[in-house]
Swiss-Prot record:
The gene coding this protein: atpC
Protein name: ATP synthase epsilon chain
Keyword Cell membrane: yes
Taxonomic source organism: Desulforapulum autotrophicum (strain ATCC 43914 / DSM 3382 / VKM B-1955 / HRM2) (Desulfobacterium autotrophicum)
UniProt-listed HAMAP family: ATP_synth_epsil_bac
Family of this protein: Belongs to the ATPase epsilon chain family.
Amino acid sequence: MAENIFLEVVTPGASVVSEEAQIVMAPGSEGEFGVLRGHTTFLTSLKIGSLRYKDAAGKERVLFVNGGFAEVLPTKVTVLAESAERRSQIEVERVRAAKARAEKRISERSVGIDILRAEAALRRAIQRLSVIETR
């Protein structure tokens, strides 16, 4: 059996994950990437999306990450995220309301509405919902 890699996910406010993982899959800025123990060292930016990993027992875990950076070393993956939430922390109704609000702002294109900001809010809401729906 292959050895595990250590995964650490931290935000400015908290340590979200700090445990052994069999594999880590993350939303890199150039596309999703997977990491096993012994991977070549690299550093990449992350986009908004789902960070998935199998814990040491083989159970698949999913987090929402709101951008950031990942440092991959042969024995460790460190994710520095702007924000990160476990599936259990995501409030479905709050996310649906945020999605509806962003869609409304984008469709209205009112004066004074920052469309890029509304589009970013919509992307975050869609990704959070996808984390909730992932089995």
